[in-house]
């Protein structure tokens, strides 16, 4: 499959839980999603203006000129075709001038950290045992339990 043009990204103000199936791809515990879904701004990616969603993202205001990409998920059949990268580029552009920093809290598997590095994010810090302390079941990525934060690389 090749990247299909154009894509549409809409801000979803209501009925955010209708996208739970996609949200669970990015965060597998519904109670955690519930903690940020209503207070966050949700975006939905579509291939056509009235088409089915292929991706979702939720961004929260963390205060002090920081926002956080809490969840981003692309439907499995559309993964590894550039949609996630384009979604993140769109979100960074949306918040440019509103927030100084967009951070991402994520598992620290090689695949995940490589993806965020390719989007311009750099390692910021780690919260040891985040998944152990906040999830009702073990969440492992390549045998690791910790959560790390990334921020965009400095721009000239």
Segments and roles (model prediction):
Residues 1-14:
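Conserved N-terminal entry element of GNAT/NAT acetyltransferase domains
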Residues 17-48:
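Active-site rim helix/loop that mediates acceptor-substrate recognition in acyltransferases
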Residues 44, 52-61, 66-73:
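Conserved beta-strand in the GNAT
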Residues 72-79, 107:
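A short, internal acetyl-CoA/4′-phosphopantetheine-binding micro-motif in the GNAT/acyltransferase core
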Residues 78, 82-90:
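Conserved acetyl-CoA pyrophosphate-binding loop and the N-cap/start of the following alpha-helix
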Residues 95-107:
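Conserved GNAT acetyl-CoA-binding A-motif
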Residues 103-105, 122-145:
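Conserved catalytic-core motifs of GNAT/GCN5-like acyltransferases
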Residues 149-156:
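Conserved small/polar residues in nucleotide/adenosyl-binding loops
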